[in-house]
Amino acid sequence: MSILFFHFDGTGNEPSDAFSASNKDESITNVLKSHLLLGGSLHRFDGRLSPHSTHRSFYYSGIGTYGGVLSRYLNMGFAFENADVASILRQALLDFQCHYHPKIERVVLIGFSRGAALARRFAALIDPFVRSGSVIEAVMDTVASIGWPNLDKAERPTSEVVFENGISLPSCVGRALHLVALDEQRVAFRPTLMSHDKRIREVWLPGVHSDVGGGYRQDGMADLSFMVMVRWLGRQLVSILGQGRLLYRHVS
């Protein structure tokens, strides 16, 4: 039995954040931490976690981290549908098509901010190809301003993440965790919550947007959020991995 992990990072977030100048309050997010602690590589593109592992993990840096300087700024601000959004989803679908097979027991989708919106959209895209209930979502503080930077809640289209028939989870998703920032006041970071559904566990945690998803150099609060996610994932995957066993390395 195998698991495929797909990691969608937040807007402007990428591995080079780890090398930001000390005077910048920047670091990697919980999305990249998850990929790396699983054993994922930034250089091994088949997603294999080790030479003998049947599990695979794929990582996609955030919207606004592709192309030249102007392209990056425009995508960070507007997240055009036919630019980074399309490129990321296209690559994720290609990775899925190349590596999904009937022995895949679970598909795990992890995302933060706009990356969380991409993860939720990706679930709808793969819904026709996977077994009902076989997908697990673990997302952090979804911000679905895709298409335009909708700062007014009244103007934010629900179609950005909410899918067919007005529900926010396709049938392929068996369980979903949504970690939400309790203290975020910025209008641009209003979360796109999930619908009321027995498959969903929505947890509000102290802190602002990047305290939940990571990205600050001082990331103690984000580490707490990460542990909540890791433990929840462990419970969802116990039937595959065995009691008390996690794929994550050096996490206790």
Which role fits each region the language model picked out?
Residues 1-252:
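Active-site- or binding-pocket-proximal scaffold segments within functional domains
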